[in-house]
Swiss-Prot record:
UniProt keyword Protein transport, yes or no: no
Native source species: Arabidopsis thaliana
Family recorded in the similarity comment: Belongs to the glutathione peroxidase family.
Described purpose of this protein according to its UniProt entry: May constitute a glutathione peroxidase-like protective system against oxidative stresses.
Residues annotated as catalytic: 41
Gene of this entry: GPX2
Enzymatic reactions: 2 glutathione + H2O2 = glutathione disulfide + 2 H2O
Listed GO biological process terms: response to oxidative stress
GO cellular component: cytosol; nucleus; peroxisome; plasma membrane
Tissue: Expressed in leaves, stems, flowers, green siliques and roots.
Gene Ontology molecular function terms on file: glutathione peroxidase activity; salicylic acid binding
Protein name: Probable glutathione peroxidase 2
Known partners and oligomeric status: Interacts with DJ1A.
Induction trigger: By salt stress and metals. Up-regulated by salicylic acid (SA).
């Protein structure tokens, strides 16, 4: 990807929580929800609960949730990857993929997040404002929508259904 700008989310390779390279190309054809997560945020419990509901309901139909821990907002994800995985899998019972901790803003912003923000800027500024900013990505890898941290996952369930191609009329 040297000089070419990415055409879709599938052009990226990220690290999983174990430090292994994961090509997002493996998610081609799936509807993705990309979320920056934190374990010690006031929004944590409600978001994980609703993300789990959506994942359970739609994973068989092609929804994949990609969670990226981030410690940039008041240090609310302070643990190492092992601690984060333990918390997310045990306390929050998440079964969706958890990736390596990333920066979503600043000079060390993960390339994936640079792309997401460029595709769907925020209200007033493109920077990620807080934990649990969510990006909905179509099965062909295009960013469809960006949701603020205060928008609960169940509030945009209809958008997920539409992206999955199964919105009820």
């Amino acid at each position: 990807m040297a000089d070419e700008s990415p055409k879709s989310i599938y052009d990226f390779t990220v690290k999983d929580i174990g430090g292994n390279d994961v090509s997002l190309d493996q998610y081609k054809g799936k509807t993705l929800l990309v979320v920056n997560v934190a374990s010690k945020c006031g929004l944590t419990d409600a978001n994980y609960k609703e993300l789990n509901v959506l994942y359970e309901k739609y994973k068989e139909q092609g929804l994949e949730i990609l969670a990226f821990p981030c410690n940039q907002f008041l240090g609310q994800e302070p643990g190492n990857n092992e601690e984060i995985q333990q918390t997310v899998c045990t306390r929050f019972k998440a079964e969706f993929p958890i990736f390596d901790k990333v920066d979503v803003n600043g000079k060390n912003t993960a390339p994936l997040y640079k792309y997401l923000k460029a595709e769907k800027g925020g209200l007033l500024i493109d920077a990620i404002k807080w934990n649990f900013t969510k990006f909905l990505v179509s099965p062909d890898g295009k960013v469809l929508q960006r949701y603020s941290p205060r928008t609960s996952p169940l509030q945009f369930e209809k958008d997920i259904q539409t992206a999955l191609g199964q919105a009820s009329s």
